[in-house]
Amino acid sequence: MDCMFAHRNSRPHPDPSASVPPRPAWRRGFTLVELLVVVAIIALLISLLLPALGRAQRAAKTLNDAANISQIHKGFLSHANSDPKGRLPTPGLVSRLPVPGAGPGGATATVPGQGEEDISKNNTASLYSSMIAANFVTPEILYSPVEENPIVRQMTNYNFQAYNPAAPAPTFWDPGFYANIHLAPGAGASAVCHTSYAHLALIGDRKKLYWTNRAGSTRPILGNRGTHRGAFSGDNYRLSYTLLFHDPKDTWEGNICFGDNHVNLEKSVIPDTVQFECGSINLKKDNIYTYDDFNSGGCKGMVEGDTWLCIGIGQPVPNFYTCAPERLTNGALPAP
């Protein structure tokens, strides 16, 4: 009996300390000072990286802008390859003047591919709209990634059904494509410019001699817009939206496409490689955003062969072409 009792009481008693988990080691956290130091370092790194990132983004936009311009010119060249004279697209040769005696009973009628050039159609809106209708360019590439002027917007609802050359009154492009860069935003449905890009003014010797697929590597054909009449001082320069296209923002720079399709980022409205001479005027650098109106020397001014890139509006006539005066960043029209 005593043995049995002793056996029952010989079981080991559990150690009370075994059921208590070990106390974790104390961990030291950040002090307020250390946290502020980390935040300051992160802020410093961000301040250093953001400008570099911004510059990289702007450089990428400049490259994409040049690609747009090159692609537009390639569309022009594709059109020129189907023209017997190698002419770049000319709206007045698409929508021509009616032909006397071509209609029933000898009436005057519009005949596709026939008739004299309708010079009044040779403005910027008709040029680009006719190219979209013929699928040589798209509305997307006519809007620049570096655009800053709020009046300029990509056209997203181009009416391809407007192309109807077989209609009794033929139409060849959407007339709702506008290039009214001179208007103020909110001034009506037509107060919009659906393209960012200027082109060689379609008038005079410059059109006759250089609006072709043989223009060469020193002849500008199209590109970024310039300051009003090629200004390089005063408010017409300082307040121009075109100064905001590329870096730096306080000087004008622009992508320009030449006749051989190469695109160069020019640093001045008077590029080193673009020159012109006429009559007794010696070879000189050419301001590519205005026609050279020499006081003497036998030059013909607006109808000469010098480079003049602009956005043309209205209805051109043989001796006059209207270049749209783009509003300044303060909303005012540029000084004449």
Language-model segments: residues:
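Compositionally biased, low-structure terminal segments
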Residues: M4-A6, T31, N295, Y321-T322
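N-terminal leader/signal peptides at the extreme start of proteins
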Residues: M1-F30
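Amphipathic alpha-helical segments typified by the pilin-like N-terminal helix
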Residues: R27-A67
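Short hydrophobic "helix-edge" motifs at membrane interfaces and signal-peptide entry regions
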Residues: P24, I41, K249-D250
